[in-house]
Design a protein with these regions (language model features):
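S-adenosyl-L-methionine
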Residues: 1-17, 255-278
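Core catalytic lobe of class I
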Residues: 2-253
Length: 278
């Protein structure tokens, strides 16, 4: 059974506590807000419809704000990520502001200690047809960026298995693992969080970049999908998963979801970097 902790707290505050306590994680696995909400639609009803992806977050930063926010996020990751740790960053571009994603990825490379080591294409099982835009295709894929520190590009962990070793040189040959995965959009509809993100996808990623003793951090836990994936990872796993979420409703939903999965409730308990005031 994994140790799963849900924190109803801003991830930047939690990472500050971690850094001060010198508490580190092996893997960051997350799907951040995409800054996809629309402010240029004509009616209030349309605004309410488009901007209801999450129950409390409008997700409506402009491009410059989003890039600055992303840079701060990754500089904070650098303070808590173990040596040779990896960030798995599921993100896609918005219909109204597609530049925001590309600019934020560029800023990660240029303004933080990190680089893009790989890019995985996630094909979702279904997608809403794009019947209202004359020049945009129906998007059925998203990206998962594999991000490591620039000075750890040759050493960051990945669980590809060795298939053969050349006797005369010792050269290792690894199994083929393609940078393409098909997984469900989500684990079921939830009105609190309409973002696409599934535990099947997370589990596939954990198999590649984690082990039974890994500590996994999700700064945008939402409805607990990363936590469920860590629980599914291995029945006898000692994996730890720490998730942050601003929405109290989503945190409570996550606890109940984990309770249903385990058939017994595990309350969120104090974690090693917590202070006495919580």
């Amino acid at each position: 059974m994994a140790k799963v902790y849900f924190r109803n707290e801003n991830c930047f505050d939690v990472m500050k506590k971690m850094a001060e306590a010198k508490y580190t994680v092996d893997l960051v696995l997350t799907s951040p807000p995409y800054a996809t909400s629309r402010s240029n639609v004509r009616t209030q009803k349309a605004i309410d419809t488009y901007n209801s992806r999450y129950d409390i977050c409008l997700d409506n930063m402009n491009e410059d704000e989003y890039v600055e926010w992303t840079v701060k996020l990754f500089n904070d990751f650098d303070k808590i990520l173990e040596k040779d740790g990896v960030v798995l960053y599921n993100i896609s571009y918005g219909s109204e502001n597609p530049n925001a994603m590309w600019r934020s990825i560029s800023a990660i490379i240029e303004k933080t200690p990190f680089m893009i080591a790989d890019c995985i294409i996630w094909k979702k099982k279904s997608a809403l047809p794009n019947n209202v835009a004359h020049n945009k295709l129906t998007r059925i894929t998203e990206f998962v960026y594999v991000i490591c520190r620039k000075n750890e590009f040759k050493t960051f962990r990945c669980n590809k298995k060795v298939k053969n070793v050349r006797e005369d040189t010792g050269q290792k040959y690894y199994e083929n693992v393609f940078n393409f995965v098909e997984a469900p959009n989500n684990d079921g509809a939830c009105k609190l969080n309409k973002a696409t993100y599934s535990s099947d996808l997370c589990l596939w990623l954990l198999d590649l970049y984690a082990d039974n003793e890994s500590t996994v951090f999700d700064p945008f836990m939402g409805t607990g999908t990363t936590g469920i994936a860590c629980e599914r990872f291995c029945d006898d796993s000692t994996m730890t998963c720490i998730g942050c979420e601003l929405s109290e409703k989503q945190v409570e939903f996550s606890k109940e979801r984990l309770k249903r999965y385990r058939a017994e409730h595990q309350d969120s308990i104090e974690i090693p970097f917590d202070d006495d005031e919580d």
